[in-house]
Curated annotation (Swiss-Prot):
Record family assignment: Belongs to the universal ribosomal protein uS17 family.
Function of the molecule: One of the primary rRNA binding proteins, it binds specifically to the 5'-end of 16S ribosomal RNA.
Name of this protein: Small ribosomal subunit protein uS17
GO molecular function, one term: structural constituent of ribosome
Assembly and oligomerization: Part of the 30S ribosomal subunit.
Matching SUPFAM superfamilies: Nucleic acid-binding proteins
Keyword Ribosomal protein: yes
GO cellular component, one term: cytosolic small ribosomal subunit
InterPro entries in UniProt: NA-bd_OB-fold, Ribosomal_uS17, Ribosomal_uS17_bact/chlr, Ribosomal_uS17_CS
Entries under Pfam families matching the protein: Ribosomal_S17
């Protein structure tokens, strides 16, 4: 079975080799038919501490690394600086 991959934005990099990634999802409410946006934070392993808050990253499911980390950063795009 293939590993799940999610796309999100880094919201915190204050831990060593770990980033917190916010993943947004959209769905339609089954009764009211309104599009709703929900978000969830995932702790992901970042071996080289290369991603900073605001960067767009892709995370992939992995075996448990610690109590909260079950995802690994696969690739990312640094945000453009002005």
């Amino acid at each position: 079975m293939p590993k799940r991959t999610l796309q999100g934005v880094v919201v915190s990099d204050k831990q060593a080799k770990t980033v917190v990634v916010r993943v947004d999802r959209r769905f339609t409410h089954p009764i009211y038919k309104k599009t709703i946006r929900r978000s969830k934070n995932y702790h992901a392993h970042d071996e080289n501490n290369e991603f900073k808050p605001g960067d767009m990253v892709w995370i992939e499911e992995s075996k448990p690394i610690s109590k909260l980390k079950r995802w690994t950063v696969v690739r990312g795009e640094q945000r453009k600086t002005a």
